[in-house]
Regions:
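Surface-exposed coil/turn segments at beta-strand junctions on protein surfaces, enriched
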Residues: 87-89, 104-105, 134-136, 148-150
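Residues that flank catalytic or metal-binding motifs in active/ligand-binding sites
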Residues: 67, 92-94, 118, 137, ...
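Aromatic-lined ligand-binding clefts that engage carbohydrates, nucleic acids, or primary amines
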Residues: 60-61, 71, 98, 103-126, ...
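Short solvent-exposed loop/turn micro-motifs enriched in small/polar/acidic residues
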Residues: 91, 113-115, 134
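Alpha/beta-hydrolase fold catalytic core
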Residues: 78-84, 89-92
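Short beta-strands within extracellular/lumenal beta-sheet-rich domains
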Residues: 88-101, 139-141
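An acidic-aromatic loop/edge-strand motif
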Residues: 1-79, 135, 145-172
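Solvent-exposed beta-strand/loop surfaces of large extracellular or lumenal domains
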Residues: 82-84, 117, 123-141
């Protein structure tokens, strides 16, 4: 909490890295930024290692041929904690099959997800088409026409909720 003293936070292991960064920032903002980026990169590597949808650098759950019969259905926009599970911080994947008519194949497709909390990578037919960091930023992506197919296409969004409420939550 914002009113918790530094002395109290020193006894909470989860705050050790951030307290170190804040103390460094008092004298060397560049060093603090480097420490923050290293801490964040380590955290992302830990999260990616736990993500069953990733196999190394391959987003296997973005594969349009993936069998998702056992996946649960949900509606968006909604926070993950309200629509799926109350205690999730981490990665969750969303998929939607979209049927495109032949007349749509001549131009790039524009996708607007609205805001996503906190980060996302958007795939179309297994190919990444956009990525955004920031919890309150509208997502606007362009799908090149060479990725479009007549009939079924698959939109996949990997959402990384870093804490608090998360998900695809705003109006698109």
């Amino acid at each position: 909490e914002a009113w918790t003293s530094e002395e109290t936070l020193k006894h909470m292991p989860d705050f050790e890295d951030m307290l170190t960064i804040l103390n460094i920032a008092q004298t060397d903002k560049t060093a603090a930024e480097q420490k923050y980026q290293a801490t964040r990169q380590n955290w992302e590597q830990e999260m990616n290692a736990l993500d069953e949808g990733l196999e190394g650098q391959t987003a296997r759950w973005a594969n349009p041929e993936l069998n998702t019969e056992t996946w649960k259905n949900t509606r968006v926009p909604a926070y993950i904690e309200q629509s799926i599970t109350p205690d999730l911080d981490g990665v969750i994947w969303f998929r939607k099959e979209i049927d495109l008519p032949k007349t749509w194949l001549n131009e790039d497709l524009k996708i607007t997800l609205g805001p996503v909390d906190d980060e996302d990578i958007c795939y179309f037919n297994g190919v990444p088409v956009g990525q955004t960091h920031g919890y309150n930023v509208e997502r606007h992506y362009t799908v090149p026409k060479n990725l479009l197919r007549e009939g079924p296409n698959v939109l996949t969004v990997r959402v990384n909720d870093t804490g608090g409420e998360g998900g695809i939550y705003g109006k698109a």
